[in-house]
């Protein structure tokens, strides 16, 4: 009768540290996202996506960096504030935290327990219906429209067409004597009126946009 004794040796392998740096443009996008939702689930890859707590704003952007793993940050502004403590921060990722390093300085920032603690965008891209109205909104007109709404104390941004031209204007549609400020942004053969809350549009990052609108 032969008896064999097996000895199993389990060793821990130290994986190579995964490091990356964030560009100024990516940090700018993250600052804007913090206005939309205080929390963010960073997903593996080069796409940053967020959604407002009430599902009224969905934002998505392709960045130059490629995140090596998915991790949730509950207080995005706090995370960005920690980054700002460093001149040239380098991020080193582990299973439960990210280390932020620059020379002799280092901070360890822990991920939150689960992304189920806050609203996250859907995994799949939204299948946007065919646009009924489209136009280019320049950064200058976008800024002037938001500034006009704030100056006049008006709660809504309206995009409307009169069968000839497309206007973007600020107004209070509940008040028939409301002040207004409008700008022509395109032409159309349709008559329509679409109303948006200023509090939502004011969270959008300044820039020039190709606007596509649908009533569906």
What spans do the regions from the language model cover?
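DNA polymerase processivity clamps
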Residues: 3-112, 128-216
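Acidic/charged, solvent-exposed loop-and-adjacent secondary-structure segments enriched in E/D, K/R, S/T
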Residues: 121
